[in-house]
Amino acid sequence: MRRPVIILLSLLLLSASMFAESGLPIIEVKADRTMIYPQRMELTGEETLMDILQMVPDLMIAGYEDVISNYNLRIDNCPLNGDTRLILSQMKAKDIAKIQVCDNTGVQKGTIGMARVLDINMKMPDALNGFVEGQGGFGKEVAGIGAVNALYGSKSTDLYANASYRHQEGNKEYLTLHMTNRFDDRNKLLTYFTQQYLDQPNGMSRKVMGRARYFHTFNDLGTELLLVGGYQYASDWSSSSKLPLCIAELNTPLFTKQLAMTLGFEGDFQMTSQKNTDQSCDVFNYDIYLQFTYALPKWRFTVGNRVMFYERKKKEGTISQKRSDTRDNANACVIFVPDHRNQIQLGYYRKYFNPAMTEAVFEDRSIHQMKLAYAYSRQKLTVQTEADYYMIEGGENLTELAASAYWKTKGLSLVGGSNLYIAKSGTSASIRFAPTAYLPHAWQIAMQVVYYTKNFSKREATGVPVYGCLSVNKQFGRHWNVGIDWHDMFDAFCSDATVNRHAANVKLQYRF
């Protein structure tokens, strides 16, 4: 009798823990970013990072190669200088612990203007796994792609490696290495190395970057110190630049567990020179940033500020121009969480556009943004809506309304959304729909469709009102996967298309 009781209690505890995990929200709204947790979703194992990103209201599949044009892709907050389309379509959601969609991180990350960050935190396996993949593109141009990806996890060391080569009107080579070393429970070191080499008809370019991030936890309360050092060199046919940087950041509870503080210093120094002229531009930034978050069971309040001391030196021949000034990015946000499924956000953000090197006068332009957002999430259903109003100094004020929804049922997932942009010069909109069917015998069929109204910038540039991509994949056993994408399919039927981009891309992948 005793043994069955023990077994029954064990099953009850297991089911309770599983219910608690499934009850956690897929989406978590923070003051300056939205967190997505793929491990809390119902996954088949074949979902990609690109599939998950279609849940976000602001992100759109604007083209086969133009996926996240407004976002800088990072892994553990380090820029990932790789083939973006390949990474998004190859990285599996089951290997991702957390996705941070950082749309207003001017305080925490020092983003400039409308720039945004897409930060990926990996879920490392207990051993080595990865894949080797080859692709062939057949359309107006013929393309060949080779890629290899590896993940390795152990108690003290994690390793992520990705390399790819693309031949299409030139050569593109990418390499990314990321290692995590855990020395003990309170000390870890993250190191990064990325390299890209592009040999295109318009010239050659290369970029090399190295970075190290050291974390030390002082106590059981979670007081943590972060130290960062890095260097990047970039060069193309017209210019070259050097960018060393350093960061020191402290994250800690303050007086009470409900109040969290981030205090940091960042220094970066960008030195750019033109190869065909005597023009050069050096920018030196020294930032101090401070942010407080006070969390109650149903409310979260955040206020932050980044004071940016900068000096710009521009030289052209014997003429030089210098400007030193101070500016500050700021945010203030309140989030109401009535229960674990619903979240409502109201926020204010101030940020700046940097002047371009080619501008005659160095002048910053400020951006003031108001944001109202709502998120609802369950394991198989998410709904997100967002309204933003931008007041842009020296530019046109803009209102953006966005909505997206994700629904998963047995054998089928549906993702859709819409974006509306309202300005004095005109109104434009887009509507997108992306269903995926998981069929018997390891078949998968997916479709991406995006419709643009007449005044939408993407439609004006391409002449095509609809973007479409049809994908078919088949898994053979544990190791082999074959797929084909027919992308930009509506270009073939549109007489107004400026460039006929429709093509078939065939993929063969071996997993180990």
Regions found by a protein language model. Name each.
Residues 124-129, 180-188, 192-195, 262-270, ...:
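Surface-exposed extracellular loop regions of Gram-negative outer-membrane beta-barrel proteins
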Residues 168-247, 281, 353-355, 360-364:
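Flexible loop and strand-edge segments within Gram-negative outer membrane beta-barrel domains
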Residues 333, 373, 498-512:
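Outer-membrane beta-barrel "beta-signal"
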Residues 42, 126-150, 163:
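Short strand-turn segments of transmembrane beta-barrel domains in outer membranes
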Residues 78-105:
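Short acidic/polar hinge/loop motifs at secondary-structure boundaries
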Residues 135-140, 154, 165-169, 193-199, ...:
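Transmembrane beta-strands of outer-membrane beta-barrel pores
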